[in-house]
Amino acid sequence: MGNIWLPRVGASWAPRPDITVRGGFGIYAYAWSLDNYGGNNTSYGMGAAKSASGNVSDQTNGITPITKLDGPGTIFGTSNPLPYVQPSTSAAPAAAYNGQAVGFVLYHVPVPKMMQWNFAVQKAFHTNYMVEMAYIGSHGSNLIFATDLNAIPANDLGPNDVADGYRPYPLFQNLTGSSNNGISNYNSLQASFTKRFTRGFSMSANYVWSHMLDDQDSSGWGNREGPQSWQIANDLAANYSNSNFDVRNAFKGYAVYTLPFGRGQAFLNHNALLDELVGGWQLSGTVIELSGQPYTVTTGQNTYQQDGSSFPNRNPGVSVKPTNRSARCAQGSFSGHCVNEWYNPAAFLEPANGTFGNVRRNSLYGPGINQVNLSGGKVFAMPGENDPVKLQIRIDATNAFNHASFGQPNGSLSGAAGVGQPYAPIQQQQITGTTVGGRAVQFGAKITF
């Protein structure tokens, strides 16, 4: 693999005692493992026992390939640096795979890297208050991307053509595996306000506006790629769009407040009984407000006979938001969208055979998250001869206001009358699940001694 150069640099400057300016840049790597490289595609990676046509099978428990694709009977021109052990059952040229779908694992795969940079300005006010503004960005390269090397080139297929004749390697069907040319980009503006704990109160709030784009996410196991939606396997740029993780707006905050009653506080501080009853109580809460994540609208009609997804065409002049909202919004409305019909399927048209739809990956956004959590508690001192015994009681309410945060709708379209016709409303556009559970209240008590 060789050495990996991962430089990192940072700087900080304080032009005044109450102002700090910081910045930094670094390159980080996702180290490869056997799971990422070989186990990524279990049917043909390292350790796989692959069988070819006829009486040819692996005799090495997946240590060496059954056949080399740069051998006789193929137009492949790749080289194989691994030692090659011929199976004992037959001399198997690559032609043993003719007419079949074949998997691949790349050699000399570069390590995925992530460049990150940031610039921030921090200002303190009256010792106990702090405001910070920051820009944070990143760029990922050499990311894993599941693809088909033998996809039919766009615009080559015409009426009455034989599809397999236009494949780059027509001796085979799909050539599926993972490439390493995926990229990602992230840019964000972040603002935060913090009050240190004084006079029984502290709080912090931060807001992030961000945009993340990529052509493949990494939500799979380890560093593997996650769920994929592409319709042009040999055109990675066509898949570059909003990331599955893109959350444009995010607000989070917390607060802690000690009630001003009892000993040492402003009120009811001279009565021992009142101090035990109302003194020392502490309340806290957190707020989470997130805008929705994107999803992809697909059609069940495979208009190009590929092994990816088929996207519809956009219907010009027709709103993506449901048109008959009054009849379908009985269970909730969010910014013009309805739980019973989150998007308008008539805004999309069935593409013609042999064409790709013009709707991009992750072009629509689902519901966001709204959650408030509240807690309260107090520590009681109990009489003890030696070490003090303390009783802590608390109550926690998760999603205290029982606000529903709905899941994503099903983006699969069906029911179009024909090519160029809009899709009909079906049950799949409804949202039937949630991402956050309902209100849960928990009481607890703990004795320490």
Regions found by a protein language model. Give the residues of each.
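Short, solvent-exposed micro-motifs at the edges of structured domains
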Residues: N3, P81-L82, P87-F449
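Secondary-structure transition/capping motifs at alpha-helix termini
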Residues: W13-D18, R196-R199
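Signature of Gram-negative outer-membrane beta-barrel scaffolds
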Residues: M1-R16, G222-E225
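Short, surface-exposed helix-loop/turn micro-motifs enriched in polar/charged residues
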Residues: P17-T20, D387-V389
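Intrinsic N-terminal pre-sequences and regulatory tails
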Residues: A11, V21, G62, K68, ...
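Surface-exposed extracellular loop regions of Gram-negative outer-membrane beta-barrel proteins
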Residues: D18-N61, S141-T147, S284-I288
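Aromatic (Trp/Tyr) and acidic
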Residues: Q59-P72, F76, N324
